Amino acid sequence: MTLSLDATQLDRYSRHIIMDEVGPEGQGRLLSSRVVVVGAGGLGAPAIQYLAAVGVGELVVVDDDVVERSNLQRQVVHCDDDVGTPKAESAAAFVRGLNPDVSVEPVEARVDKSNVHEVVAGSDVVVDASDNFPTRYLLNDVCRFEGIPLVHGAIYKFEGQATTLVPDGPCYRCLFPEAPEPGTVPDCATTGVLGVLPGTVGCIQATEAMKLLLDEGEALDGRLLFYDAMDMTFETVPYRTNPDCPVCGEGGVDSIEDIDYVESCAISLD
């Protein structure tokens, strides 16, 4: 079902509506959509900003952290007055000020096995803007089992990556069969991150989400996009479904209940 647009919306979204790939029907589809963004930090901030601006009707923003001053160099939905405020609520307040068409739900929690089904329920797309491997594997697994497209992004210093995981394509475990050992991957507090880098990658994630919602263009399904800000290069590397994947391969599991996302994210099929 798509929504009819009133005069104010026809004006607000006029630059979309004039394009054949969107039009009034596509804009109505965006306004009828529900997107969950997990993480309201570096990647989540630009994704939230643009998904709200383009008129995604329902946004769920999930984050258990609070705004710190060191976040403000890159997390563009938060400002100095938000320091100490839960990121989910700060991002939600930004959305409310940006676009009254968007109903935004802040969820001040870390996604885990106990709440992930409730978090993603009813969503058309999930955007993974998290910063840790247990959450990435958890979102991959539950979205695969629930049949929900998932847009992944990650950043490191001057480099970023993104891919889109659709229900009938390869999953995150096909791409990265094993998570790194805990503590072996440094975070941005240790290595630093170029302030504009998450903006680029987060906007790519928002673009992928929009394409999925509009059913237009070619998604990054089965392709991992690499971005190097220092060389200003983009490269895509194809990947395929792993027939032995424990989630999407033959004979794989069909539930997250027996998977330990705290220790290793590994799945035993024995």
Curated annotation (Swiss-Prot):
EC number of the protein: 2.7.7.-
Record's keyword terms, sorted: ATP-binding, Isopeptide bond, Metal-binding, Nucleotide-binding, Nucleotidyltransferase, Thioester bond, Transferase, Ubl conjugation, Zinc
Reported modifications of this chain: Sampylated at Lys-113 with the archaeal ubiquitin-like protein SAMP2. Also sampylated with SAMP1.
Nucleotidyltransferase keyword on record: yes
Cofactor note: Binds 1 zinc ion per subunit.
Amino acids binding Zn(2+): 171, 174, 245, 248
Residues the entry annotates as binding ATP: 42, 63, 70-74, 87, 131-132
Assembly, per entry: Interacts with NcsA.
Function: Likely activates multiple ubiquitin-like SAMPs for protein conjugation as well as for sulfur transfer, via ATP-dependent adenylation at their C-terminus. In fact, it is required for the formation of all three SAMP1-, SAMP2- and SAMP3-protein conjugates, and for molybdenum cofactor (MoCo) biosynthesis and thiolation of tRNAs.
Position of the Glycyl lysine isopeptide (Lys-Gly) (interchain with G-Cter in SAMP2) cross-link: 113
Similarity comment: family membership: Belongs to the HesA/MoeB/ThiF family.
Any GO MF annotation of the entry: nucleotidyltransferase activity
SUPFAM superfamilies: Activating enzymes of the ubiquitin-like proteins
Entry GO terms, CC: cytosol
Variant or mutagenesis effect after changing residue 188 to S: Loss of activity since this mutant is not able to complement a ubaA deletion in trans to restore sampylation and tRNA thiolation
Disruption phenotype: Cells lacking this gene are deficient in sampylation, i.e. SAMP-protein conjugates. Moreover, they do not grow anaerobically with DMSO and do not show DMSO reductase activity, but their growth in the presence of oxygen is not affected; however, they are retarded in aerobic growth at 50 degrees Celsius. The lysine tRNAs of the mutant strain appear to be nonthiolated.
Cofactor: Zn(2+)
Organism of origin: Haloferax volcanii (strain ATCC 29605 / DSM 3757 / JCM 8879 / NBRC 14742 / NCIMB 2012 / VKM B-1768 / DS2) (Halobacterium volcanii)
Active site: 188 (glycyl thioester intermediate)
Catalytically driven reaction(s): [small archaeal modifier protein]-C-terminal Gly-Gly + ATP + H(+) = [small archaeal modifier protein]-C-terminal Gly-Gly-AMP + diphosphate
InterPro entries linked to this entry: ThiF/MoeB/HesA, ThiF_NAD_FAD-bd, Ubiquitin-activating_enz
Pfam families membership: ThiF
The protein's name in its UniProt record: SAMP-activating enzyme E1
